[in-house]
Amino acid sequence: REVGWLSPEVQAAVATYLDMPAIAVHEIASFYTMYNLKPPGRFKLTICTNLPCGLRNGNQSARYLQAKLGIGFNDTTADGLFTLKEGECMGACGDAPVMIVNDHRMCSWMSNDRIDALIDELRAAASDSPEPKQMGKKGER
């Protein structure tokens, strides 16, 4: 969380610290969507495409979001605002299709209209407040 992503150097340092093979760290980091292997946009949108969400138009919502943002999964918009990830089950199947913003905010029933409203809200939030600084040295902001 200090820099927002796990570079190969950070993964190697974690492997050394935990006394485990570097490939094991990479396997874990690449499996879970909360870990980023390249710098993410300001807003990371993770959309569920597993079966329950898929049966309730989750895949259509994912395609709509890709078209709206002009990016595919694991890509970031040119303005650096949005990164789009495909996620595994988020445990809210009754609210399908679901999406998580920045690994913390669950968004439910993500129809095209709700996606449009969310993107507008996030764009407005980005223009209202500057990008938060990344953490540098311990305690530095």
Model-derived features: positions:
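Signature of N-terminal electron-transfer/Fe-S-associated modules in redox systems
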Residues: 1-141
